[in-house]
Structure formats: C-alpha cells, structure tokens
Amino acid sequence: YSPIIIDLENGKKVEITGKIDRIDIAKTVEDKYIRIIDYKSSVKNIELNSVYAGLQLQLLTYLDAACKEEDVLPAGVLYFNLIDPIIKSSKNMSEEDIENEIRKKFKMQGLILADINIVKMMDNKLEKGASTIVPAYIGKDGDLSQTKTSGVSRKQFEYLQKYMNKIIKQIS
C-alpha cells in the first residue's frame, strides 16, 4: 500500500510507511470488508485508552491506509499471537479438550465490526457462545453480545481513523 501522507498546519507533510502482516478480504452482496491482522510474539490487545494517548496507532494506521487504497469497509483490526501455547492442567485432558484450550490461546484480540453477519464470516462455525477465533460472543437470543464482544460500529471505526490522523498531526 502507498504511504499515508498527512498534511500538517505548518505546510509540511508527514509520510507514514509500514508493512501490514496480513489483510483478509470478505465480500457481501453490497460491500467489501477488510480485516487487518498483526502478528505478535506475545499476547496483545487494543486498549482504547492507549489509542487515545497516541500510544497504540499502528493497526488503525494500517486500516486507514488500506481503506484509502481500496473501496473497502473495516471488519476488524486484530493481533494474532504466534507463541506456541503451553497448556497446564491438574487433571487428565482429552485430545478435544487440549485442542479447545489451544484454540483459546490463539484467539485473536482487537476490535471487530459489531455486525453479526460480518462476525459469522470471520468465524463460520459460530452459532452461540464465544468465538474461538475473534473477540465475539453470540447470546442465547442469537444476537451479538455488546458486553462480551470487542465490537465497534462503522461510525466508531471512522471516528477512530479520524482520531488517529489527528493524533499523528499533533505529535509530528
């Protein structure tokens, strides 16, 4: 993707470059969605207070660059832990239990679009309960849980992208 160019008030420009580890694209009848994934060697999550402080802008910057290059909507910005998980247990576990525990350790963390259809595209086996892939939870009523899902609306993603640009201007 092309670098992001931000015009400063003093007439200068800031050019931001980086390498996106992974971009997933999903299409619906009406729209095309992207999910930005950053590989990490430790467990990491997006903390909105860190975004607010200008300390955690990388994934939002990548999202902004990808959205400007293509006609796409954000589906999520996520971290994927690459460390081989160690499962500890005081009891004997079946292979299935061990696999479930490993899946939990590899679950991506971050922000996703709070849209049940998009969530189900990210985890096509999710019917009810917690996703083993993304930070989402579908309740017994079949709706996306607002308290157990790290979800934001399209408007909130737009706001976060605008805020990221504002912070970069301020710190440049």
Q: What is the predicted role of each segment?
A:
Residues Y1-S172:
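Structural signature of nuclease core domains in nucleic-acid processing machines
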